[in-house]
Amino acid sequence: MQHLRPIRRALLSVSDKAGILEFAKALVERNVELLSTGGTARLLAEAGLPVIEVSDYTGFPEMMDGRVKTLHPKVHGGILGRRGQDDTIMEEHDIRPIDMVVVNLYPFAKTVAHPDCSLADAVENIDIGGPTMVRSAAKNHKDVTIVVNSNDYEKVIEEMDNHQNSLTLDTRFDLAIKAFEHTAAYDSMIANYFGQKVAPYYGDTSQPSGTFPRTLNLNYIKKQDMRYGENAHQQAAFYIEENIEEASIATANQLQGKALSYNNIADTDAALECVKSFSEPACVIVKHANPCGVAIADTLTQAYDNAFKTDPTSAFGGIIAFNRSLDAKTASAVIERQFVEVIIAPSINEDALPILATKPNVRVLACGEWQEAKPALDFKRVNGGLLVQDRDLGMVKEENLRVVTQRQPSEREWKDALFCWKVAKFVKSNAIVYAKNDMTIGIGAGQMSRVYSAKIAGIKAADEGLEVAGCAMASDAFFPFRDGIDAAAMAGVTCVIQPGGSIRDDEVIAAANEHNIAMIFTNMRHFRH
C-alpha cells in the first residue's frame, strides 16, 4: 500500500536558493499554494509567483532581525497536525494543513570556516526555526513531506506527476531520514565548534580555539556495503565525508572491475597517499597496506618497471598507484607482467582503457587531480574509545636537516635519502627503506625491533639481485642502538636519514663514522601503526 498524501500547500524557506525558483514554479503549476519567509518569499514574488508571507498567514510579524519568523502554532500546528485525528482542533484555531516543507539551514559551516569569523558571527548563523520545521515535518512524515536537499526537487515533481500530485509513504520516509541526517549533521557542526571554544569571547575578531572539541560528533555518508570486512566473518561498509575537497579513494570513480573489497579500499588508500607525495612521475605498489615497491622516473612506465623490481613476489596481487594519467604503454606493461587487484591514477587515458579491458576483473579507478594535502583528523578505535589526532602532513624542511657525521652525503646520496624518507612515512613501523637511483631496493616493515627491519630490507634487496652498495637508508624513527647502523653497513648502505633524538645518538653517530656512513637527522618522526 502506497499511503499517498496529496500536496496542496507547501512552506518554502531556504538559505541555499539553488533550484528553488524552478521547483516553486513547478509546484504552482500543480496548484500548490506557497507559504514563504524573508528572502525566499521576495525571490518568489519577484518572479511573479503567487506566494503568501508566513507573517500574513500567522498575523504575527517577523521580528528581532529575523530571529523569530516561523516559531508560531499556526505554522507548527499545520506541520505536526495528524490528518484525521487533529482536524477539529486545527479548524477551531484556523490552522491550515501544510503538506510539504522545503527548508535548508543557515550556512553555519561556511561562516565558521572563515578565518575572521567571531563567536558573535557564528551565533547569528545558528538556525532555530529551520531545524524546528525540519524536525516537525520529518516527525510527521506519515502525512507531511520534508525536502532539505535541492537534489531531490526533480524527484519530488516526477513522483507528484505519477501520483496525481501525491507522494508515497516510502518517499516521505526516505526524505524524513535525510532530514534527520541533515539536522544531526548541523547540530554536530555547532557542537564541535562551541566545544573547541576556550571562553565565551564576543569581540569583533576570531578567537583562538582548542584543537579538539569536548564532544566529538562525526557524520559520514554510506557509499557502499561491502561483501565482508577484513575477514569473511566480519560485516562492513564504506562511509565517506561530505564535500570532500581532496582527491582520494573516497572520490575515486571506478571504471571497470569487480566491486572493491574492504581490504582493497584500505590498501588503495595507502598506495594513493604515498604516491601523492612525489612531484615527479611516480609509481607505488602496495601489499597489505605496506609499500613493496616505489620509484620515480622520467616516464610513468619506467617508474612502474623500477617499482616492480623491488619485490616482484610481493607485487603479485598488489595495488598499483600512479600520480600521472595512466597511458597505454604503462597499462600494457602492468597487464602483461602481473596479476593486479587495483590500479588507481588521477585519470586514465582513452587509449589505455581497451588494454585494461582485456583483464575485466582488474579494478581501475580514476580519483581526479590533486593539489596540496588538506588538514584533517585521523582516527583509531580502541575498545571503548577513539584516538584522534591531526593528519600527519609533516614535511622536513631543508633548514631542519642536519648532517651529524664527519662525511657529508654526496649529491646522489642526498637525493636518494630524501626519496626513501618520503617512502618510510608510509611503511608500518618499525620501518626501514633502502633506496638507490630513485627506486626502493629493499623495504623492512612492521618489525618489533628496528635492527630486524634493517636486516629484512637488506635480505629483500639481495633476493632480487639489487645492489645495495652506495644506497641510502631511511628509518621512520631514531635508532636506539648502533646495531641498526652496523647491519646497514654490512649490507652496503653509505647514507642514513633518520629523526635522531635517542639518548644513544652519540653511539649511533660514532658507528656511522666508523663505517664512513653519512648520516642526516630530520628532527621529525613518522611512526605508522
Curated annotation (Swiss-Prot):
Ranges of residues in domain MGS-like: 2-148
GO BP, sorted A to Z: 'de novo' IMP biosynthetic process
Keyword ATP-binding listed: no
One Gene Ontology cellular component annotation held by this UniProt entry: cytosol
PROSITE patterns registered for this protein in UniProt: MGS (PS51855)
Keyword Hydrolase in record: yes
The EC number(s) this enzyme carries: 2.1.2.3, 3.5.4.10
InterPro entries assigned to the protein according to its UniProt record, in alphabetical order: AICAR_Tfase_dup_dom_sf (IPR024051), Cytidine_deaminase-like (IPR016193), MGS-like_dom (IPR011607), MGS-like_dom_sf (IPR036914), PurH-like (IPR002695)
Pathway: Purine metabolism; IMP biosynthesis via de novo pathway; 5-formamido-1-(5-phospho-D-ribosyl)imidazole-4-carboxamide from 5-amino-1-(5-phospho-D-ribosyl)imidazole-4-carboxamide (10-formyl THF route): step 1/1; Purine metabolism; IMP biosynthesis via de novo pathway; IMP from 5-formamido-1-(5-phospho-D-ribosyl)imidazole-4-carboxamide: step 1/1
NCBIfam families hit by this protein: PRK00881.1 (NF002049), purH (TIGR00355)
PANTHER family: BIFUNCTIONAL PURINE BIOSYNTHESIS PROTEIN ATIC, BIFUNCTIONAL PURINE BIOSYNTHESIS PROTEIN PURH
Record protein name field: Bifunctional purine biosynthesis protein PurH
Record organism: Proteus mirabilis (strain HI4320)
